């Protein structure tokens, strides 16, 4: 078959496919006039824009990964409640009070925490967050409606609440804003791929995966390129300079995790480690003098992988927590 | 000295009463002492010991006036990380269902044109 003839056959097949699609459309619409530009019409856009936001009731213990409006109404005294919020890695979360009906004098409260805190362990850790712990709480009973919106510093936040009186409660709206250079992230999924970039910022950034995972680092850049020559940082590890560390642990706080590997120099190519801890973290320490970047993939370990100890893994420490 | 110790005992009793909630099911809040030696980034100003406490404000209102009580309490949730995963999986499932509903609505709009 000559190349020209092959090309003609492909062209005919494309036309047949297009005709088939149009035919199906005509069958559905009967005598309707086909106009592909309708997909971009202003009416359609307005119709879609007028969609109602996602709404649902909030439970005493809940997790929200979608923006929308959420209402909690107590049907009995609810004394120990919390809702976790998580967005995409490149999103900030904004919590807006729409309506609050609680009795602050009677012991009710509504407190937003900038991050997650579980069993006293925080993400981001105190070392990685710009504010001290106490200032990461925003108490509705102290600020009232003078501060109706609270924005998180990363893709996670949470709210603690207590409501004694049945019928009382609150309504909040959750929105997300883009975060161009995500610093501290908790992954929504047990598998994925991410690039952590810290451009000339003196800060420590952590990517947390609350699953046992295999992490494969494909690219680590510490310093910026001058032409083709990579400028290396003066010091890479030992707690100074620019470096990446892999951590594993049973809680949320990276500063309380076990260091499993330090990556002190830039490299290309896959470097994989299995971390069978409840929580695995890729943490970048940056001096602020360079553009640092690490790209990695992660996937949840299968049960049989947790049982066997092979390859580049540290099972003794982590398996004890399972 | 006697007054000081009496005050300490009083605070301990209050703390014990607050933390003890008979019959409360999981989850529960943890009221944890804030470690004043906790490491913070050098660029952040260290919080003074006179900072206000968090937690149930009515229960801790008297601690502001106490010159002897330097323990601050933070609010935390006492649930295992496994439960957090379950909640996360439920949230992803609901998000997927919501996305499917949104897609169906979009397709319905397109189909009517």
Swiss-Prot record, chain A:
Species name: Mus musculus (Mouse)
Entry GO CC: axon terminus; dendrite; dense core granule; extracellular space; microtubule; multivesicular body; nucleus; perikaryon
Subcellular location: Secreted
One Pfam family matching this protein: CRF-BP_C
Molecular function terms from GO: corticotropin-releasing hormone binding; peptide binding
Disulfide bonds: 60-81, 104-141, 183-205, 237-264, 277-318
UniProt name for this protein: Corticotropin-releasing factor-binding protein
Primary localization: secreted
Signal sequence, renumbered to the chain: 1-24
BP GO annotations: behavioral response to ethanol; cellular response to calcium ion; cellular response to cAMP; cellular response to cocaine; cellular response to estradiol stimulus; cellular response to estrogen stimulus; cellular response to gonadotropin-releasing hormone; cellular response to immobilization stress
UniProt record similarity statement: Belongs to the CRF-binding protein family.
Coiled-coil residue spans: none
Glycan attachment residues as annotated in the record: 204
Keyword vocabulary terms for this entry: Disulfide bond, Glycoprotein, Secreted, Signal
Function, in words: Binds CRF and inactivates it. May prevent inappropriate pituitary-adrenal stimulation in pregnancy.
Swiss-Prot record, chain B:
Post-translational note: Glycosylated.
Alphabetically ordered keywords of this record: Amidation, Glycoprotein, Hormone, Secreted, Signal
Region feature (Disordered): 37-64
Molecular function, one GO term: hormone binding
Record flagged with keyword Chloroplast: no
Major subcellular location class: secreted
Compositionally skewed regions (Low complexity) per UniProt: 37-61
Pfam families: CRF
Valine amide, modified sites: 110
Gene Ontology terms describing biological process: adenylate cyclase-activating G protein-coupled receptor signaling pathway; digestion; hormone-mediated signaling pathway
InterPro entries linked: CRF, Urocortin_II/III
Subcellular location: Secreted
Similarity field: Belongs to the sauvagine/corticotropin-releasing factor/urotensin I family.
Protein name: Urocortin-2
Organism: Mus musculus
Gene: Ucn2
